[in-house]
């Protein structure tokens, strides 16, 4: 499968999805569609469709945004230094879609690598396990579990 950002896909974004992914915005905490999602499946870039995170790596951090311990395909996630808002953080962007996803912090579960990928729901599209094969993501079944 080829993943890329197209003008057509960008034009389909809601105003909030555009603000978050194309203008480096952040959702208000506890407002995102996937914050409390516990269904098995994968999360892909809303623009390019590239696989980003799996339900098996999602955890409740209490921060108000979906949190994951690691990307499903590390090469699909770029990490960049972010000096905005008077802080030094690590921004997370999709590699093919160049969408702003959120940030990664070193305060995740220690027994699962110690990282917390804090991701905006507006940057994601959830593919339920039962639809993964039909949508072309069947190769990721081994990274999805009931949570």
Curated annotation (Swiss-Prot):
Its EC number is 1.8.4.12. GO terms for cellular component: cytoplasm. The keyword Cell membrane does not apply. Residues 6-129 form the MsrB domain. The active site is at 118 (nucleophile). Gene3D superfamilies: Peptide methionine sulfoxide reductase (2.170.150.20). It comes from the Bacteria. It holds the Pfam family SelR. GO terms for biological process: protein repair; response to oxidative stress. Transmembrane segments: none annotated. Keywords: Oxidoreductase, Plasmid. One of its GO terms (molecular function) is peptide-methionine (R)-S-oxide reductase activity. SUPFAM superfamilies: Mss4-like (SSF51316). It catalyses: L-methionyl-[protein] + [thioredoxin]-disulfide + H2O = L-methionyl-(R)-S-oxide-[protein] + [thioredoxin]-dithiol. PROSITE patterns: MSRB. Belongs to the MsrB Met sulfoxide reductase family. NCBIfam families: peptide-methionine (R)-S-oxide reductase MsrB. PANTHER family: METHIONINE SULFOXIDE REDUCTASE, PEPTIDE METHIONINE SULFOXIDE REDUCTASE MSRA_MSRB. This is Peptide methionine sulfoxide reductase MsrB 2. It comes from Rhizobium meliloti (strain 1021).
